[in-house]
């Protein structure tokens, strides 16, 4: 997992040197990081970074709604929330920069391929509900429902992808059985609501990281990203659900949009 985290940082944190990334991910020296990275990915860290930048640039240039000139972008500050209002071809979206609190969460984790697998997620949520419902957690209006994406599908092999379905709990509550517990750190997040069908999630995540983030004055942080299920915003239209995609961010060294 250290190497996969390093690969993500190479792509998302251009201001960090390769040596800094290796040390951040727990390698004792730049040489040990370089050797391990090349064995795992089949190319050097510097080449990997340059290839990823080239691919991202090609996607940015070739897709019409990812062309900066084709987007209408308005930035608004209200109290403690900075909002990006973005109008593209056939859509309007709002990305809020918010400070989220830390949460103690109970979770069920799955390792393996999960893209578009609604049956899998139903089983995971039912398993979590079996433990949480008798405690009144699913009917608690203060409960927060999250899906945590631990790995980048573009980097991690499908059979090693990890995903967790989660519910917020009190700090002193101890889960049992297959239900785990962890603390999700708070901090600054970019939050955007989407109404998605089972096959729509990759494009929504891609829009956040590939369209909005490069145009913002932020860069990705290395905390975990997640989807928040919004019970009171659901619409009765089949399999589509409303979620807020939340990605951890920090201020970039320079602003791309003035």
What are the roles of these predicted feature ranges?
Residues 4, 8, 16-19, 28-258:
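A solvent-exposed interaction/effector surface
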Residues 21-23:
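Short alpha-helical "recognition helix" segments of helix-turn-helix
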